[in-house]
Amino acid sequence: MTGPLVVTAPPAVDPSHDCVLCPRLSGHIAAWRTKEPDWHNGPVPTWLPPQGENAVRLLIVGLAPGARGANRTGRPFTGDASGEALFAGLDRHGLARGHRPGSAGEGVDLIGTAITNAVRCVPPENRPVAAEINACRAYLEPTLARFAKLQAVLTLGKIAHDACIRALGGRVSAHPFGHGAQTALNGLTIVSSYHCSRYNMNTGRLTEAMFDAVIADVAGMVQGR
């Protein structure tokens, strides 16, 4: 005699808007909801191209939403200085269209590319703690598995890089972060870059030429060049 059929729902790829998995982050968002009630003020979902997830060959993973960027707009990297650098590069190499200088991603459409963050909620002072990074892996893991045609992952910053390596079941020591470094894991090519934050760009840790070279490399991979 067989038991009842148990149907297990697939893991969620995006947290609910009222997620309270990380108390410090949910409290921080609650404060933003009071200050700016018309903003997104919640976990930021993965941004897909207009053609949907089956068109995605490249996934870009950043650190976390910016307070006045993605936390306001609800789309990763949109509305802040890091988005200005990212979308300019994606547009130059055929991975996005519609970028206008100074728009910080407003009005952009992605091409064959999805964008997400290792931590989905805006953290105080843009600094998530280890427990929050680990908790949000519950969404990063199914996001990495979501795209049937995914070929490459571009990680922006060491935290995003390490989170992706762990989410794919790898050891960080075997796949260390380095600007422009590439490593293979679970059938994917992981490409790393310093984060395109205003601080990194202003201090010269990351120049436009350095960032453009990495985007050109990953574009060549997913576009078959």
Give a label for each model feature.
Residues 3-224:
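A polyanion-binding, active-site-adjacent surface
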